[in-house]
Structures are given as C-alpha cells and as structure tokens.
C-alpha cells in the first residue's frame, strides 16, 4: 500500500502552509490597510523611495492688460526607506502529522501569521505615528479623554486644511483611553446616539465625530509622562511600502527529523511630513 511521507507530501505541504499563514496575517492587518500603500513602486527593487512633496499653489488675480506670472516652486521630497526585515521561525517535528491535525495546523499557522502582522502594525503605530509631535494634545489626566480634548485634536487637523469626515480619518486608543471614551456621554448616551447605536448596549463605540475608533495595545496605558495614549491620523499621513510581502519558506532538517518554517517580510514606513510639522495630519494625545 502506498504511504504518504514527507517526500510525497513535499509538493503540497509548503503551499498549504503559505496559504494558511498569509491568509491569517492578512486578516490581522488593520493599520497597513489604513495608510498610503506604495508597495507597487518598490516591487522592482531599491532600498529607498523618494516621494515628491508638491508645494501648495496659490491662484493669482489677472489684471487687465497684464501678463501672467509663472511660479517656480522648490518642491521637497519624503524619503521612504525599505529597511525593516522582520521574521517568525519555527522548527516543527513530524510535519505531516501536524498537517493532518487541523486544530494543531491552525494553531501554528495563526501564531506565525499573527506574529508577522503584529510586528508590522507595531512599527507603524509606535515608530511612525507616535513619533509625530507637531499636533500634540496634552491630556488633563493620564489616559483620560474628554470631548473638548478630542475636538481640540480635530481642530488641529482643520487648521492644517484636513477634513476628518472623508472616511480616511481614524482614531486609535490604548485600552485605558478607549475605556475613557466609552464613559463619555456625548458618544454613548442613548438620548444622543439612539438605542441602535448605543455603546451601552453594544459595547462598541463604532465612531466618534465620524471617525472609526479602535482599541490597540500598541498605544501605552501605563500612565508614563508624555506617553501617547491615543492618535488621530489620516491615510495621507503615513507612507508604507512592502518590497517583500510576507513569504513562507520551509526546509526539512533530517538531523532533527523536523521541518524548519520561516515567515519574513521586508517593508518600510514613514510620516508624509516632518514629525514636528503642523501640516502633518497626525494628532497624538499625550499623558501629562
């Protein structure tokens, strides 16, 4: 009787692992899908992407009988470096047996896919978004939101000429800051929002002033001075590019009677303006 072995299963095992891990990673991506993705521009190689910043133009009034004046702006640029190489690796013994156990297979695939997604999301949140300082709002108390403070953050976007009602503006909050928002009656009272959308019933905030709201542990809630407890940002505020989408590679190691599986990704992300620029559509809420 024919037997399915590591040799005969070799053709389908890598593909199945790849599909399962990448599918789970994609489901876990959230921030990546809410920023400006320029991956197609680095698909052919290169470790840096120079993105022109076109200077805002001001229309002039033409006087009768006068010639038009031509502008000669000096446009800047934003440099996006593809310099983050992250990975997750496991050595799994008796791979075919794991493969045949759907529960165990699912646990491994989810674990590896989640690790990659979490690493990329954490970089965008902590190293990019939370590095912005130009539109900071200082909270009155650690991890404590008020409607006035949120409106103050929105005003900073408006002062920079940005709309927050275009469906491309998001509010992320630490668990403690999110919990504080849940306690604001302006966003939770049934008399204000109606019972169908009332977080006191659903447990979900949904949106605040038209912005989707998400709780994330990538925002700190330990009460440290200056820590970012929440962030409002627009899609245009962050540039992201992945030169190597999460890939899965495997190799059987006869010395260990196990299969080594590695998932890795090569990417970069940066703010669309200088971190201290008030024109940057990113607002951080900082602990006092």
Task: State the predicted function of each range.
Residues 56-59, 64-76:
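Active-site-surrounding "flap" and adjacent substrate/cofactor-binding loops of secreted or lumenal enzymes
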Residues 94, 173-175, 265:
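Short, structured patches in soluble enzyme cores that scaffold and shape functional sites
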Residues 94-164, 279-288:
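Alpha-helical scaffold segments that mediate packing/assembly in large oligomeric complexes
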């Amino acid at each position: 009787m024919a037997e399915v072995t590591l040799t005969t299963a070799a053709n389908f095992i890598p593909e199945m692992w790849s599909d399962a891990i990448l599918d789970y990673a994609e489901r876990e991506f959230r921030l990546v899908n809410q920023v400006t993705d320029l991956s197609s521009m680095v698909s052919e190689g290169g470790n840096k992407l120079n993105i022109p910043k076109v200077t805002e133009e001001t229309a002039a009034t033409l006087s009768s009988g006068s010639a038009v004046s031509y502008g000669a702006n000096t446009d800047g640029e934003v440099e996006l470096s593809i310099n983050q190489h992250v990975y997750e690796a496991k050595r799994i013994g008796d791979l075919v047996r794991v493969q045949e156990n759907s529960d165990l297979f699912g646990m491994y695939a989810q674990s590896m896919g989640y690790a990659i997604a979490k690493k990329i999301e954490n970089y965008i949140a902590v190293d990019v978004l939370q590095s912005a300082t130009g539109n900071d709002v200082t909270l009155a108390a650690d991890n404590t939101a008020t409607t006035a403070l949120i409106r103050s953050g929105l005003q900073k976007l408006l002062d920079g000429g940005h709309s927050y009602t275009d469906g491309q503006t998001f509010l992320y909050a630490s668990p403690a800051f999110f919990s504080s928002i849940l306690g604001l009656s302006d966003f939770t009272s049934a008399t204000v929002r109606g019972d169908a959308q009332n977080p006191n019933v659903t447990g979900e905030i949904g949106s605040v002033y038209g912005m989707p709201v998400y709780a994330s542990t990538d925002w700190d809630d330990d009460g440290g001075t200056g820590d970012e407890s929440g962030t409002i940002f627009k899609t245009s505020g962050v540039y992201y590019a992945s030169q190597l989408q999460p890939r899965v590679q495997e190799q059987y190691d006869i010395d260990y009677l196990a299969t080594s599986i590695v998932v890795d990704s090569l990417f970069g992300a940066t703010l669309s303006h200088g971190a201290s620029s008030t024109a940057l559509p990113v607002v951080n809420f900082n602990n006092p």
